Amino acid sequence: MKKSIILYSLFFIFFSSNTAAIANEDYVKYVNPLIGTDTSFELSNGNTYPAIARPWGMNFWTPQTGKMGDGWVYTYKANHLVGFKQTHQPSPWINDYAAFSLMPSVGKLSVLENERKLKFSHDNEIVEPHFYSVILDEINTKVEFTVTDRSSFFKFNFPKSENSNIIIDAFFKDSEIKVIPDENKIIGIAKNNSGGVPENFANYFLIEFNRPFKKSGVW
């Protein structure tokens, strides 16, 4: 009887210790959101984009190398970024729904994609399921963002400059932007879609800044 009790006790202790070790394991570190992004229209190697999001989150965020309306939002071989995009895209073939993007700028303001795009290197990029960071060397600016179930937090680390800007691109198809400078807020509606939506389909968003605007405008 004593031997049975001792063996049972040892097994129980071993099992309990092993369970605690598993519970404390950080499985997020094993996830690489870049898997499947080395792809193109001509050759599919996954057709994915690095989705920074909570599980079942309302919105996904992703760095953007493709042009507005291009289903290949982020391709690993690209060396320029045109924005950081809130996306609801299920696949490149279906394209996106109710999307808009943010993009920092320093110096002369250019809002068009081909003019505002900036070089980046994967060596200066951190991509995790819950966090993204990249250094844009051309303007000496670091961009970081993380997400919640329904919102996101961005941090733009600009150099000392009298002309640092954040461009908000609400895409097309009757989308709207309104600047509220007295409250450091911008509100907007993104309606872009690829069909199959109700007549009142829209994504209503609010962006709040921690610093006042020196100037603002829409185009």
What are the roles of these predicted feature ranges?
Residues Y8-S16:
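Bacterial N-terminal signal peptides
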Residues I6-L7, M58:
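General helical structural elements
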Residues N18-I22:
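Sec/Tat signal peptide C-region and signal peptidase I cleavage site
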Residues M1-S4:
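Positively charged n-region of N-terminal signal peptides that target proteins for export
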Residues A23-W219:
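Accessory carbohydrate-recognition regions in carbohydrate-active enzymes
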